[in-house]
Amino acid sequence: MRIGLLIFAFFLFGPLAQGQKGVSAVSKSAIRVLIVDGFSNHDWKQTSLMVRRILEETGRFEVTVSTAPNSADSLSRTSWDPQFGEYAVVIQNCNNIQDTSLRWPRSVEQRLEAYVRGGGGLYVLHSANNAFARWLQYDTIIGLGWRSRSYGYALQLDSADRITRIPPGQGEGTNHGARFDAVIHIVNGHPINQGYPQRWRTASMELYRYARGPAENLTVLSAATDSVTGRIFPVDWVVQYGKGRVYASSMGHLWKGDVYPVSYRSIDFQTTLIRATEWLATGKVTYPVPAKFPTADATSLRAEGDMPGGPDTRSLTR
């Protein structure tokens, strides 16, 4: 009986909640996740690696990476064939803002649309909302993205969390200032943030100002006050697209040369990544909020040497 209770506690609380190191054994009921990467102005390889490690460390996820062709080579483009339907969640980690000629084949775009519309889960990871400005259904799927002043609606909140839809041509195009330790507050309760404090401080976040798009069937989960303008903008949001669930967030910045930056060591980011991915797959969240979750007064970080899955961040094969 005692052994059974210990096993149950291990799987209930997981490595992050307990501060344990090493990748947990993947359970037979693990959620299958596909990360799609291949090009970005951010370090997409290291981002995919860290996201995979954070998820697989829990023992709840089985993660695969599919790398899109990052050239115009027709053979590699036509041979790339990610099977979205084999996974409960797709994590989008491509960004072509630095070179808009880099696109997925139209057949792959259409399959992602059908996948989400039919009930698949999509996680739009940080700069992935910068991507594919010419793909109109992608804009509908993600709700808000990095777009020009002339396109789409931007959302801004007041001190009572009332949302103003700023129409095309007003306000600014999407931008951000320097990264800062932002105080995030809950705007709408949701299974992802259930059990979080009303306010908490996240480490080194890049807050997107004036993210723009159709903003249809969209619910803002949390927001933060910009350190320069004093204006309040969404941090993360969910979108219902057909039968599918979509989660997008400003959190998750990892720049070229970063290995395990404080933004990824931040316990709130890791917890939210895990809980959002579980929700996208199941519509429910069972992963616990760790005791070391940050407060409004202080960030909370895993130690620099406490790498998800072990000390060598580059040893996990892709």
Indicate where each model-derived feature is located.
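Helical hinge/lid and interdomain linker segments adjacent to catalytic or ligand-binding clefts
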Residues: 22-24, 28, 32-132
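Extracellular ligand-binding/catalytic regions of CAZymes and related secreted enzymes
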Residues: 22-31, 46, 57, 82, ...
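An acidic, glycine-rich "communication" segment
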Residues: 29, 125-228, 289-318
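Short, solvent-exposed loop/turn segments at secondary-structure junctions
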Residues: 40-41, 96-97, 129-131, 198, ...
